[in-house]
Amino acid sequence: MEKLVVHGGFTLRGAVNISGSKNASLPILAASLLTDEPVVVRRVPDVSDTNFMVQIMGQLGASVERSSGNVRVEARNLHSEAAYEQVRKMRASICLMGPLMARMQRCVIPLPGGCVIGDRPVDLHIRAIQALGAQVQIERGNLIIEAPRGLKGATVDLSGDHGPTVLGTDNLMMAAVLAEGTTVIESAASEPEVVDLANFLTKMGANIQGAGTRRIVIEGVEKLRGCNHTVIPDRIEAGTFMVAAAMMGDGVTLRRVCEEHMTVVTDLLRKCGHHVEFNERGDTVTIIAGKTPKCGEIKTAPYPGYPTDMQAQMTALFATTPGISVVKDTIFPQRFMHCSELKRMGADIKVDNGTAVISGVETLSGAPVMASDLRASAALVLAALKAEGTTEIHRLYHIDRGYEMIDEKLLAIGAAVERLPDDDN
């Protein structure tokens, strides 16, 4: 294992290239199994989650070549059973269900792993595939799914307790593109990553209308073809670096971003007194930390609301912002494990019933802290940049799941960080 050692207090200046979206890459890679023709996906981030997905696809029989951010997939000879050893490491592996069912009418997928941040049930995925005519059994920790007569189009409502499901929408779209007839997805997720998947599927020859709205209509086709596709920028990585710049920046420029996807984070940072300016094309943004930052309030919500994947980072910002800030997570109310570690660094945070109340303190102090999940680890890195002294962040593998070369990118803008072997874990 490795740890990240951060020496706090250094001003951040310079430029960073934002990677392609991890959350878009995973279902797009899975969707490449829908055709036996070659597919090339560009700007796939080199993070452990995409590496796991590539390994699983190879185990399923696909030929997968990876080079300099490009992934070439040719899935001529597939088999339908995914291995537990890789699937257990990544929650998003459930999105293999849709392509395998569409292509082979059968799949066996171990119930997946990933971040442990509260209940993330696969019930909606199961309900959706059953609506298309599949039979589902759970045996010895495996989902065994079969549709001997093929998948048939249907109307499926994906509404859940905490809003639309992104991976559920992805999975159902992928299953429906080769199904017989028309599939209508009600209460669909409208995140940019869902739209990117729909654009990729459309390039392959799928007939999809309404992606980006709450109602998606898919007319099944007989066959999909190969294509080339470039993944959208990672809005969560961009947001994380925007917050880092708001905490310690004196002119940090982020390239390869999408202004349209960053609206809610941009508006919040400006409201809290920080300077955020995009270029005319909306693909480059410069952030300068405000001299008189203000406290704020956020409530997570499905897109275009404030993303749950950005609440931990904003909590780190609020920890040293004067006044009382409030963070409420309506999507994953248990997603506050980072707060206990921030408190070890001197933060004043009270968490109750899915809400964190943060009283800003003047300074944080470096301390040994433990990452508990992907975005929590990002929050700890941000806090460490601001803290006085040295912080050691253990279980660095969490952050490597979703941030490409974060230590190198931070070094490029003036942070004092080093990745070291973790002898304590």
Swiss-Prot record:
The active site is at C115. GO terms for biological process: cell division; cell wall organization; peptidoglycan biosynthetic process; regulation of cell shape; UDP-N-acetylgalactosamine biosynthetic process. It catalyses: phosphoenolpyruvate + UDP-N-acetyl-alpha-D-glucosamine = UDP-N-acetyl-3-O-(1-carboxyvinyl)-alpha-D-glucosamine + phosphate. Keywords: Cell cycle, Cell division, Cell shape, Cell wall biogenesis/degradation, Cytoplasm, Peptidoglycan synthesis, Pyruvate, Transferase. UDP-N-acetyl-alpha-D-glucosamine binds at R91, R120, P121, V122, D123, L124, D309, I331. One of its GO terms (cellular component) is cytoplasm. InterPro entries: Enolpyruvate_Tfrase_dom, Enolpyruvate_Tfrase_sf, MurA_subfamily, RNA3'P_cycl/enolpyr_Trfase_a/b, UDP_GlcNAc_COvinyl_MurA. The modification 2-(S-cysteinyl)pyruvic acid O-phosphothioketal is found at C115. It comes from the Bacteria. GO terms for molecular function: UDP-N-acetylglucosamine 1-carboxyvinyltransferase activity. Its EC number is 2.5.1.7. It is found in: Cytoplasm. Pathway: Cell wall biogenesis; peptidoglycan biosynthesis. Phosphoenolpyruvate binds at K22, N23. Cell wall formation. Adds enolpyruvyl to UDP-N-acetylglucosamine. Belongs to the EPSP synthase family. MurA subfamily. This is UDP-N-acetylglucosamine 1-carboxyvinyltransferase. It comes from Akkermansia muciniphila (strain ATCC BAA-835 / DSM 22959 / JCM 33894 / BCRC 81048 / CCUG 64013 / CIP 107961 / Muc). The lineage of its organism: Bacteria, Pseudomonadati, Verrucomicrobiota, Verrucomicrobiia, Verrucomicrobiales.
